[in-house]
Every structure is written in structure tokens, then in C-alpha cells.
């Protein structure tokens, strides 16, 4: 029983891959930037509507008379409000840790269990159970980049192809991994599950 990477634990017959989900630095960055931008827009809109400088902490020379409330201030209010809703959505996905979970590969019992957290409600906990004998192959859906020297694999997403449930993603579909990392995971799983790897 050893940790083979920061998010993978493996013994001879069991492997557990832990999935981070929405609590990664990129998601925190975008949630913070969206919140900051939308609050800035709303402060400018409030300054133009009330003819007061709510941005004095940034610049004492800001003249609220430069931006009339109709139509510029009203438009900025709409953008600021929309930004607040987007920011709220991003912060809630981080709070609920949507997409996090684990992949359990148990050769001894002959099963693969995939668990993910979703949004609150009926699908808050998503649990998929697959028999190892039902797995046909591992699929790397690659994203290639054309350069002068030729085509290169830029990133990819790993799927597990099953007979009954079709292709099940093992990595986040919107978060493509770099080639060495996805090749390493696919190779390790192929060896453990004794299934071929297909690249598309």
C-alpha cells in the first residue's frame, strides 16, 4: 500500500485515484477576478447614479459626472449584476466542491467504483459501479497541435469504454491533462485492468 503520486494510492490489487474537482487554483482565480470586476462595475454605476465618488480608494480624481447614468450607468449596472451572479455560481461550485470524488479500481472484487460530487439535489452524489470484465478499453481523446515540424499531442482526456454504460470519463472533460501525465495514468490503469489503450 503506497502513494504513487499526490492523488493516487495503490496496492497490488487496489488503486484509488482522488479527484480534486472545483477546488483548484484556476477556479479560485476566476471566481475572485469575476467578483472584483463586477463589484467595480457596480461601484462605477452607483457613482454615476448618486453623483458621488465611491471609487475614492482607487482614485480621488474620478469624476462621477463623466459617466451619465442613462445609458452608460444603466448598462454598467446590468454587467455588474450579471458578473455578481456568475461569481456567485463560481463560489458555490467551489463551496460544494463539484466534480471532486474518487475512482476505485478493485481487482480482488472485480469492480470499478466511480464517485463524484455534483450540485445539491437529486444528483448530489453520483456513483457508478462497473464490473472489470465489462471494461473494453481505455480511450485517450487527444487534442493535437499542428506545428511546422509536424503534429504534437498537446493534451488529452481519459475515458473508460464499457460494454453497457459506454464511455465514462476518468479525468475532467474540461480540464485536459498534459501528455506525460495522461499517458502515465493510462499506462498504469491498462496494466492493472489488463485492457488495451486506444488514442483518438
From Swiss-Prot:
List the InterPro entries hit by this protein, alphabetically.
Answer: PSI_Ycf4_assembly
- GO BP field: photosynthesis
Please tell me the species this chain comes from.
Lotus japonicus (Lotus corniculatus var. japonicus)
Family in the record: Belongs to the Ycf4 family.
What role does this protein play? Answer: Seems to be required for the assembly of the photosystem I complex.
> According to Swiss-Prot or TrEMBL, what is its membrane topology?
Multi-pass membrane protein
Q: Which UniProt keywords apply?
A: Chloroplast, Membrane, Photosynthesis, Plastid, Thylakoid, Transmembrane, Transmembrane helix
Q: What is this protein called?
A: Photosystem I assembly protein Ycf4
Amino acid at each position: 500500500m503506497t502513494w504513487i503520486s499526490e492523488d493516487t494510492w495503490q496496492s497490488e490489487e487496489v488503486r484509488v485515484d482522488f479527484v480534486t474537482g472545483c477546488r483548484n487554483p484556476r477556479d479560485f482565480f476566476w471566481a475572485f477576478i469575476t467578483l472584483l470586476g463586477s463589484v467595480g462595475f457596480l461601484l462605477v454605476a452607483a457613482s454615476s447614479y448618486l453623483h458621488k465618488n465611491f471609487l475614492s480608494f482607487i482614485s480621488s480624481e474620478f469624476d462621477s459626472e463623466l459617466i451619465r447614468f442613462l445609458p452608460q450607468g444603466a448598462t454598467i449596472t446590468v454587467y455588474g449584476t450579471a458578473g455578481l451572479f456568475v461569481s456567485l455560481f463560481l463560489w458555490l461550485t467551489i463551496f460544494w466542491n463539484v466534480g471532486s470524488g474518487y475512482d476505485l479500481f478493485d481487482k480482488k472484487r472485480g469492480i470499478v467504483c466511480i464517485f463524484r460530487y455534483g450540485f445539491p439535489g437529486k444528483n448530489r452524489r453520483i456513483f457508478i459501479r462497473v464490473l472489470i470484465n465489462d471494461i473494453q478499453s481505455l480511450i485517450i481523446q487527444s487534442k493535437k497541435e499542428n506545428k511546422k515540424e509536424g503534429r504534437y499531442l498537446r493534451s488529452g482526456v481519459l475515458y473508460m469504454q464499457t460494454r453497457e454504460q459506454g464511455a465514462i470519463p476518468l479525468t475532467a472533460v474540461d480540464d485536459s491533462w498534459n501528455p506525460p501525465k495522461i499517458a502515465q495514468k493510462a499506462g498504469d490503469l491498462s496494466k492493472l485492468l489488463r485492457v488495451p489503450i486506444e488514442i483518438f
